[in-house]
Amino acid sequence: QHSRFELTGSFFNPGPYSGFLVAILPIALHYTLTGHRIARILSGVVLVLLLLVLPATLSRGAWLAAITGCGIVLSNYFHLHNRLKALFQKHKLTVFITTICIFFLVTGTLIGIYRLKKESADGRWLIWKVSSTLVTSHPITGVGFGHFAGAYGEAQAAYFAAAERSAGEELVADAPETAFNEFGQITTETGIIGLLLFLTIIIGAFKAARHSNSKAATGMVGSLAAFLVFACFSYPFNVLPLLVLFTLLLAQCTPMQPGSRWLSGIFYTFLFLPVYFLATGQQEREQAYKRWKSEQIYFNMQIFERTVDNYKKLYPLLKDQPAFLFEYGQCLSRTGQPETSNLILEEASQLSADPMIRNIMGKNYQTMKQYTQAESAFLKASRMVPNRLYPLYLLAQMYNESGQIDKAITTARLLLEKVPKVPSSATEEMKRDMQKLIKDIQ
């Protein structure tokens, strides 16, 4: 269980946990309505448990997904489309008034859901807004698979540098690893081409399920629809169990078609080859992860002279991990290798939106007396996540060290005016240091 959350299941976070629950809910409802006696009883028990647990996760996206998935199952079971069509033909005025009432009810419900965790919703809206600028600048092929976070950090820095933004936007800004919308992330990373391929797979699965004779087809369609609605507000493709569940739902929606054996053999051979090549390299990579975790003990103890050499050996296997690159860059910085450190940290910045990467790069430039580059790094870190005080703190100190007194005072005053997102003893200490800096200079 996560220390910040009371209900996480085995997912360490209520978000993915609620996604797992909501993907099962429509299937449980379907079998409760259509299953045989034992299946109906077991499915009913599961359904009740899911309905009890799901509200406690406080996942608004999961609630909307549950309504969508269960709505599909209920609509099919009670033939609501035909009934509503007949009702509309007989009582047009009544249906019209009822529709208006339902519209206002849904609108009020959505507003209530938004206000439930307003700051979280505003933060996701900012992520989607900034992500849209990446889609605009890289519409066809995207920024590259796995490069969302790094590209997002650059885009958010450009967004806050371009114009004066509201205090509310500055307060909710953060350094996300995902877009909190899988459709948006797919488009950002792989462009319109990737999105169209993904939509083709989804539409194909729905069409196949529609023409399927399977009794479970409706439940699977409801679950897949619920999963996709949840994917509009979260990051299920970044959680392996949910990615496996999504694959299984796609497979269940697409029944096997009879075909020639040799074609099937060729298909499975090509399917197996990438799995084989990936699996053969995993053992060495797993050992590298274990060595990294053991070396982190010395890293946290700040024994950098020992750690830096071992990190260098692990670099070829873990150079796609931004957390490892950040630690390796710090080790190089703390062992008197600022130039090499910045090369490693530049790689990390391509994979992560964390402004601390730019802060360390700025300190490295400052060590090398390259004050212009240091200023650029600190300013970018400040614009990436404007509610953080540390980049401005480092920038003011750098200005003071380099003799840029006016800029030092201006930056120190700017920091004192800032309201930190999470006040702490560290932020209070930084403000005291800035007050002292201004007093000493003047």
Model-predicted regions and their roles:
Residues 109-123, 268-302:
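Hydrophobic alpha-helical transmembrane segments in integral membrane proteins
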Residues 1-5, 9-93, 97-114, 188, ...:
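Alpha-helical transmembrane segments of multi-pass inner-membrane proteins
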Residues 317, 350-351, 384, 418:
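Structural marker of alpha-solenoid helical repeat scaffolds
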Residues 1-11, 145-188:
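Interfacial juxtamembrane loops and adjacent helix segments
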Residues 324, 357-358, 391, 425:
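TPR alpha-solenoid repeat register
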